């Protein structure tokens, strides 16, 4: 007959307990070495610590662009919409006097760190992560994750207008970053790197000549199309990124951010159109002739 005996409530040493690896745990959990392994090699960092480190790298990397963007946006997006004649060049000269000579290098370093940390962060977040359920593309907001990772800034036009928030497999901010990188490299190539290599500077007179060029390849593929893509993706990526950086979570506030982003984008397109319609026949030789000639030489294109 089994009898129960009262024992004093003393702590039990776990080392004195029997270890049965296969009784209640998956194979390998009984190993005293609890370090995680990748390809069989133990590593000391957890996924959360990697995320935290990469997120901090992204936060630090935006500082040069966050300081530069207001000046550049006022010069390139707003001023030409108000007065496309000489005002943009006047503001450009003033901005160049304010900024240090290493501005471009700081921006390139910050962008490189930002992109690298972002790609690695995506890899860490998606490591062994189950795929999202793709059913029920539009959901009622009360049942849905309304974070920017899930629905973007406002969940698309339907979310902005009607509260039917669209979920995205890849966040719109990430997509805009993927689009932004190649056009930004092209922008730096024709506006900074190649002009510096031939000892010239690009101003708004050059931009007007490019956008009103009789050469359709220069005008559209070399000028208007990449500038429009840069404008749309850049303003959205920076605006939604700042919204996330400042911890804006309320949907009403995010809709206000979205409205501001759309208005700034619209003003930017007005600036492009006004610059394109400017008379560039009295502006002298087109500097982009030498710039594109240099690019053709670099690409070995006749």
Curated annotation (Swiss-Prot):
Short motif PxP, span: 4-12
Q: Mind telling me which InterPro entries this protein's record contains?
A: MCP1, MCP1_TM, SQR/QFR_C/D
Location comes to:
Mitochondrion outer membrane
Q: Which domain of life is it from?
A: Eukaryota
User: One biological-process term from Gene Ontology?
Assistant: mitochondrion organization
- Coiled-coil regions listed in the entry: none
- Membrane topology for this entry? Multi-pass membrane protein
The chain's Cytoplasmic topological domains, given as residue ranges, are 1-61, 122-173, 241-258
Residues crossing the lipid bilayer are: 62-82, 101-121, 174-194, 220-240, 259-276
Q: Name one GO cellular component term.
A: mitochondrion
SUPFAM superfamilies under this entry? Fumarate reductase respiratory complex transmembrane subunits
Write out the topological domains of type Mitochondrial intermembrane: 83-100, 195-219, 277-302
Write out the entry's keywords from A to Z.
Membrane, Mitochondrion, Mitochondrion outer membrane, Transmembrane, Transmembrane helix
One GO molecular function term of this record is: protein-macromolecule adaptor activity
- Its main localization is mitochondrion
Q: Give positions of region: Disordered.
A: 1-35
Task performed by this protein: Recruits the lipid transfer protein Vps13 to mitochondria thereby promoting vacuole-mitochondria contacts. Involved in mitochondrial lipid homeostasis.
**How does this protein assemble?**
Interacts (via PxP motif) with VPS13 (via SHR-BD domain).
Please state what the protein is called: Mitochondrial adapter protein MCP1
Q: Which organism is it from?
A: Saccharomyces cerevisiae (strain ATCC 204508 / S288c) (Baker's yeast)
């Amino acid at each position: 007959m089994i009898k129960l005996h009262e024992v004093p409530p003393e702590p039990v040493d776990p080392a004195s307990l029997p270890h049965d690896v296969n009784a209640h745990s998956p194979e390998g959990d009984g190993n005293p070495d609890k370090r995680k392994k990748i390809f069989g090699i133990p590593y000391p960092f957890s996924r959360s610590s990697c995320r935290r480190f990469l997120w901090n790298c992204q936060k630090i990397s935006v500082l040069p662009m966050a300081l530069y963007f207001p000046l550049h946006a006022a010069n390139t997006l707003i001023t030409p919409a108000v007065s496309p004649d000489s005002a943009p060049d006047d503001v450009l000269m003033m901005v160049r006097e304010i900024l240090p000579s290493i501005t471009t290098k700081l921006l390139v370093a910050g962008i490189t760190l930002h992109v690298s940390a972002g790609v690695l962060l995506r890899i860490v977040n998606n490591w062994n992560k189950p795929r999202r359920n793709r059913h029920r593309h539009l959901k009622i907001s009360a049942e849905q994750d309304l974070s920017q990772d899930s629905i973007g800034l406002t969940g698309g036009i339907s979310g902005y207008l009607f509260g039917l928030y669209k979920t995205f497999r890849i966040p719109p901010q990430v997509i805009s970053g993927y689009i932004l990188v190649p056009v930004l490299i092209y922008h730096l190539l024709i506006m900074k790197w190649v002009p510096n290599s031939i000892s010239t500077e690009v101003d708004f007179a050059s931009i007007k000549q490019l956008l009103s060029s009789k050469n359709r390849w220069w005008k559209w593929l070399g000028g208007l199309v990449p500038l429009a893509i840069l404008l749309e993706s850049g303003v959205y990526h920076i605006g939604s990124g700042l919204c996330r950086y400042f911890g804006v979570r309320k949907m009403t506030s995010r809709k206000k951010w979205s409205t501001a982003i759309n208005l700034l984008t619209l003003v930017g397109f007005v600036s492009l159109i006004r610059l394109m319609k400017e008379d560039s026949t009295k502006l002298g030789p087109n500097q982009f002739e030498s710039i594109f000639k240099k690019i053709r030489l670099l690409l070995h294109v006749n």
